[in-house]
């Protein structure tokens, strides 16, 4: 896939899954990713805060091999060098990480650059500085980070969709029970962490979320 084809996945009611071993009920990231990919997910973000860089490299390399088999995208959280080394499709950076222009210069034009945003100002700045997609949240209360940002609510999704012309990935506390609220406010790409990785049956949970997204895309309410 070229970059344009890859970015089209962010605009087509797809599920964007992040790894989080702390919440995966003792299961390894690689095993969680395998189940998620088997269920049909096309976008994976490798986010791992606690392991050594060697451990992250070894794990990300295996996940890259898996995503390639499934023709899925691999986005690396934070680490530009790791993204480049394992030949990921992109990197996701936060407000306090490397500037977008630095990431672009280091990784090249074909890499996807995603940026976390919490406010309207940050959304506009991300667009103006050349982010390929925006992670917008947390929409609802979320506790996967040590210092969670307060929830920003649903209305900003609709505002962002109408004010910038790059994909918006809604993230933060999104679950099967509230996903319709997020979709109704204009989100076309939904990120989930604990709703997926903490499920007893990751495959079935993921399949059900995908079914909801596809149903919404096709104009059917399957709730």
Swiss-Prot record:
BP GO terms, sorted: thiamine biosynthetic process; thiamine diphosphate biosynthetic process
Cofactor remark: Binds 1 Mg(2+) ion per subunit.
Source taxon at top rank: Bacteria
Catalysed conversion reaction: 2-[(2R,5Z)-2-carboxy-4-methylthiazol-5(2H)-ylidene]ethyl phosphate + 4-amino-2-methyl-5-(diphosphooxymethyl)pyrimidine + 2 H(+) = thiamine phosphate + CO2 + diphosphate; 2-(2-carboxy-4-methylthiazol-5-yl)ethyl phosphate + 4-amino-2-methyl-5-(diphosphooxymethyl)pyrimidine + 2 H(+) = thiamine phosphate + CO2 + diphosphate; 4-methyl-5-(2-phosphooxyethyl)-thiazole + 4-amino-2-methyl-5-(diphosphooxymethyl)pyrimidine + H(+) = thiamine phosphate + diphosphate
Binding-site list for 2-[(2R,5Z)-2-carboxy-4-methylthiazol-5(2H)-ylidene]ethyl phosphate: 142-144, 173, 193-194
EC number: 2.5.1.3
Sites where the protein binds Mg(2+): 78, 97
Record keyword Repeat present: no
InterPro entries on file: Aldolase_TIM (IPR013785), ThiamineP_synth_sf (IPR036206), ThiamineP_synth_TenI (IPR022998), TMP_synthase (IPR034291)
Pathway: Cofactor biosynthesis; thiamine diphosphate biosynthesis; thiamine phosphate from 4-amino-2-methyl-5-diphosphomethylpyrimidine and 4-methyl-5-(2-phosphoethyl)-thiazole: step 1/1
Positions with a binding annotation for 4-amino-2-methyl-5-(diphosphooxymethyl)pyrimidine: 45-49, 77, 116, 145
Listed GO CC annotations: cytoplasm
Obligatory cofactor(s): Mg(2+)
Keyword list, A-Z: Magnesium, Metal-binding, Thiamine biosynthesis, Transferase
Pfam families documented for this protein: TMP-TENI
GO MF annotation terms: magnesium ion binding; thiamine-phosphate diphosphorylase activity
Family statement: Belongs to the thiamine-phosphate synthase family.
HAMAP family per record: TMP_synthase (MF_00097)
UniProt function note: Condenses 4-methyl-5-(beta-hydroxyethyl)thiazole monophosphate (THZ-P) and 2-methyl-4-amino-5-hydroxymethyl pyrimidine pyrophosphate (HMP-PP) to form thiamine monophosphate (TMP).
Protein's UniProt name: Thiamine-phosphate synthase
Organism: Dictyoglomus thermophilum (strain ATCC 35947 / DSM 3960 / H-6-12)
């Amino acid at each position: 896939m070229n970059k344009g084809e890859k970015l089209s996945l962010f605009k087509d009611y797809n599920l964007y899954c992040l790894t989080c071993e702390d919440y995966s009920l003792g299961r390894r990231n690689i095993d969680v990713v395998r189940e998620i990919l088997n269920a049909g997910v096309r976008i994976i973000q490798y986010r791992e805060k606690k392991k050594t860089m060697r451990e992250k490299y070894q794990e990300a390399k295996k996940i890259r091999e898996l995503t390639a088999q499934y023709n899925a995208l691999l986005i690396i959280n934070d680490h530009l060098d790791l993204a480049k080394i394992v030949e990921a499709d992109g990197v996701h950076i936060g407000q306090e990480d490397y500037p977008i222009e630095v990431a672009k210069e280091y990784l090249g034009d074909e890499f996807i650059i995603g940026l976390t945003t919490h406010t309207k100002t940050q959304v506009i700045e991300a667009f103006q500085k050349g982010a390929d997609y925006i992670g917008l949240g947390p929409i609802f209360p979320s506790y996967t980070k040590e210092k969670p940002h307060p929830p920003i609510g649903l209305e900003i999704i609709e505002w962002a969709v109408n004010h910038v012309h790059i994909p918006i990935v809604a993230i933060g506390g999104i679950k099967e029970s509230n996903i319709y609220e997020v979709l109704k406010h204009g989100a076309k790409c939904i990120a989930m962490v604990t709703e997926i990785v903490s499920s007893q049956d990751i495959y079935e949970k993921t399949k059900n979320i995908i079914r909801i997204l596809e149903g919404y895309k096709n104009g059917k309410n399957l709730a």
